[in-house]
């Protein structure tokens, strides 16, 4: 006994001529999640040095993410690097509309797809077995929570005070100057930094900023059996 169903809803007409991503608009698929496509972590080799204010100087050919920064944060080694999908040389969300969304893309959908159920049963020597299974084959969600993102909120500082970096930092002999970075691209999380739960500089998408803008890498898989 097996059942499978699927559905998808598209807006055919809506009074939103600007097609703002934060609202409904004609042609929008209901439940779409917009965000950036994660590339990797920044390496020290992506920069040529630092400015006096601590911001990093991007090497030629590396797309700048300075427009995404919420002060006093600056992108640097160990931080999330997003893909420059529109080839402009700078990462942004355009005007936050369907027609001008910069490097944003649909990274998932929050509605359940491929809902299924099946039943198994039988008997043997007077023993009856009856099993029912139910699940969703595909569903995504963008959620901001401390369990997903350690040290994302300022209140998490006390919990993770001894885990401020999952990357190695090299210091001078007097321990006063950072001389280099060893970035592990296999790390689960980027350089930890508090206060990322607030709204960033990009319009039309869910909350999250700096390393935790809505993005493909940290999209939550809500499928289940």
Question: What are these model-predicted stretches?
Answer:
Residues 103-106, 215-219:
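Extracellular loop and loop/strand-boundary signature of outer-membrane beta-barrel proteins
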Residues 112-116, 221-225:
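Residues that define the transmembrane beta-barrel architecture of outer-membrane proteins
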Residues 95-101, 207-214:
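Short glycine/proline-rich turn/loop motifs
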Residues 1, 117-119:
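Membrane-embedded beta-strand positions in outer-membrane beta-barrel channels/transporters
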